[in-house]
């Protein structure tokens, strides 16, 4: 995940690459493409699609949301992976054997996408489930932050054993709010001490193991006036300085409702690009991802 400084990640429309998309991804400011279910029919097709992409831009990286459970973009001809909640339940019932199994699931997920020439998955989810957020729910390992930390560490080890990078999400924790940031503006009224003693624990334990982190599109008004996506407090002071994270920071989809600021989508993009020279922030003009990386920073583990 090197050389992401000030560059962009885009999505594409279908199962083949259009001429317009070839022009977009050949731009030197584009570093990656994220694939969705709409881009996948079977393994042969997606390999061909990725070959088209990399023939157009050889150094481009390919990512996918292949978490397991209900968020698994590639399904046909792939092993159906268990949800993280199912793995967490196994961890609660049989901790010793679960660690090895969870590591194997992480390895399997990463190996399958690697064999299709995908470079990384936006996984694992590190949110602590408080039985509040339907958008998180069974995507979380557990309602116990320590169990989330242990299970996620094993999952990450499996990903790394397969030779791929990992992305922990959604910093500093999306599991305690009901609103879905895809269609709403989630807000959490808790204090910083409450967040540090609960939701932040998995991120604090795992920063040295994570190659990248994705912030949540949500606000903590009693902690900082800015949403996490745009917050110097959360991204610089807490994540970079306090937790010593040196890897890549991906934003979630900027077209989501939770990413809106006063103005419109273009204003959100301009907010990032105007800071890019100082902070290493790039924006996906197609509406998918923000990429932020500290100058000189490398992968976290």
Please provide the spans of the model-predicted regions.
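Second-shell residues forming the walls of enzyme active-site clefts
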Residues: 10-11, 17, 38-58, 62, ...
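A generic, well-ordered mixed alpha/beta core segment in the N-terminal half of proteins
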Residues: 82-112
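Extreme N-terminal starter segment of soluble prokaryotic enzymes
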Residues: 3-7
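Catalytic domains of carbohydrate-active enzymes, especially glycoside hydrolases
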Residues: 24-35, 117
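Conserved small/polar residues in nucleotide/adenosyl-binding loops
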Residues: 272-280, 297-301
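Generic short N-terminal amphipathic or hydrophobic helices
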Residues: 280, 289-290
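Active-site-proximal loop/short-helix segments
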Residues: 74-81, 119-139, 143, 165, ...
């Amino acid at each position: 995940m090197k050389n992401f400084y000030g560059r962009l990640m885009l999505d594409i429309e279908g199962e083949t690459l259009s001429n317009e998309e070839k022009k977009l991804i050949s731009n030197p400011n584009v570093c990656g493409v994220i694939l969705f279910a709409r881009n996948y029919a079977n393994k042969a097709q997606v390999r061909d699609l990725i070959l088209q992409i990399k023939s157009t831009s050889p150094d481009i990286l390919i990512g996918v949301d292949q978490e397991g459970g209900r968020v698994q973009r590639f399904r046909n001809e792939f092993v159906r992976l268990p949800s993280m909640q199912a793995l967490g339940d196994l961890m609660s019932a049989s901790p010793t054997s679960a660690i090895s199994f969870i590591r194997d699931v992480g390895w399997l997920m990463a190996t399958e996408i690697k064999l299709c020439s995908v470079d990384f998955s936006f996984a694992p989810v590190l949110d602590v489930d408080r039985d509040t957020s339907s958008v998180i729910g069974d995507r979380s390992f557990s309602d116990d932050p320590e169990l989330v930390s242990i299970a996620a560490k094993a999952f990450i080890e499996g990903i790394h054993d397969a030779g791929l990078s990992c992305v922990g999400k959604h910093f500093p924790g999306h599991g305690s709010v009901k609103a879905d940031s895809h269609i709403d503006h989630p807000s959490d009224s808790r204090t910083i001490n409450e967040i540090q003693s609960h939701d932040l624990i998995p991120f604090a334990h795992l920063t040295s193991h994570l190659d990248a982190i994705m912030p949540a599109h949500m606000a903590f008004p009693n902690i900082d006036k800015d949403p996490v996506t745009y917050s110097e407090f959360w991204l610089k002071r807490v994540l970079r300085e306090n937790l010593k994270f040196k890897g890549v920071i991906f934003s979630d989809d900027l077209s989501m409702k939770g990413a809106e600021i006063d103005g419109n989508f273009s204003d959100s993009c301009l907010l990032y690009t105007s800071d890019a020279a100082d902070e290493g922030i790039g924006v996906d003009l197609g509406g998918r991802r923000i990429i932020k990386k500290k100058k000189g920073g490398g992968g976290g583990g």
